[in-house]
């Protein structure tokens, strides 16, 4: 517990001692802020292998460029994480073509992000906000598509009865081939038509009493 000795001033007695820590207003210019450690770690992690510009960004870049590089680094790390987790999933043969195309697209987007980050770090300029937003939105859409395919592939992997999923291509090809899907029919074979069974005709009997003749059906 801290103890304070009272102190006298021209205005009276300071009961808790004379204040020693004065308030200083934070600088309004974001360029004077220190680079957050989280940003630096994210940028270092999101750069291409063998490239480290975290120290360069920390010392020379403005806060605007640093923010853009940080956002790009987050997106690049997200792509890398998706690709690593997706490679560990067993993809059915019928879906492999679509999955490989999507993975190649994500890798291309990540390469564009890497080149943009290096350009911002070296030149010290800021990227147009509309262009940055378009790049981030493009990556976000591709990541959502990849996540949906990842969930489907994961479900197929966990379902032991999903062997039918691996035979989708074979089923589709068999449907398009009539010889493989339709049964063999011999045109020379004439099936025997069964003879219908008819009820016996009604018996007409003559009544025994006299009078007008009446016919009764039994």
Swiss-Prot record:
Lipid attachment points (S-palmitoyl cysteine): 11
Domain of life, per lineage: Viruses
Alphabetical keyword list: Host cytoplasm, Host Golgi apparatus, Lipoprotein, Palmitate, Phosphoprotein, Virion
One term under GO cellular component: host cell Golgi apparatus
PTM comment text: Phosphorylated. Palmitoylation is necessary for Golgi localization.
Region feature (Disordered): 199-218
Record's subcellular location: Host cytoplasm; Virion; Host Golgi apparatus
Main location: host cell
UniProt xrefs under InterPro entries: Herpes_U44
Pfam families, alphabetized: Herpes_U44
Role of this protein: Plays several roles during the time course of infection, including egress of virus particles from the perinuclear space and secondary envelopment of cytoplasmic capsids that bud into specific trans-Golgi network (TGN)-derived membranes.
Quaternary context: Homodimer. Interacts with BBRF2; the BBRF2-BSRF1 complexes oligomerize which might play a role in tethering the viral nucleocapsids to the host Golgi membrane during secondary envelopment. Interacts with BGLF3.5. Interacts with BALF1. Interacts with glycoprotein gB. Interacts with glycoprotein heterodimer gH/gL.
Record-stated family: Belongs to the herpesviridae UL51 family.
Protein name according to UniProt: Tegument protein UL51 homolog
Organism: Epstein-Barr virus (strain B95-8)
């Amino acid at each position: 517990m801290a103890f304070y000795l009272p102190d006298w001033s021209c205005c009276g007695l300071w009961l808790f001692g004379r204040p020693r820590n004065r308030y200083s207003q934070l600088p309004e210019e974001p360029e004077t802020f220190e680079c957050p450690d989280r940003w630096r770690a994210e940028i270092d992690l999101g750069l291409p292998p063998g490239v480290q510009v975290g120290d360069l960004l920390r010392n020379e870049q403005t806060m605007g460029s640093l923010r853009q590089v940080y956002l790009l680094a987050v997106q690049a790390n997200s792509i890398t994480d998706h690709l690593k987790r997706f490679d560990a999933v067993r993809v059915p043969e019928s879906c492999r073509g679509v999955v490989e195309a999507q993975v190649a697209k994500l890798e291309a987007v990540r390469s564009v992000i890497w080149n943009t980050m290096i350009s911002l770090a070296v030149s010290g300029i800021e990227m147009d906000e509309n262009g940055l937003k378009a790049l981030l939105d493009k990556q976000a859409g591709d990541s959502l598509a990849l996540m949906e395919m990842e969930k489907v592939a994961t479900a197929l992997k966990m379902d032991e009865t999903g062997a039918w999923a691996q035979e989708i291509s074979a089923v589709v090809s068999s449907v398009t081939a009539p010889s493989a899907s339709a049964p063999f029919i011999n045109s020379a074979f004439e099936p025997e038509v069964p003879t219908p069974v008819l009820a016996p005709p009604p018996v007409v009997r003559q009544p025994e009493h006299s009078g007008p003749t009446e016919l009764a059906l039994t």
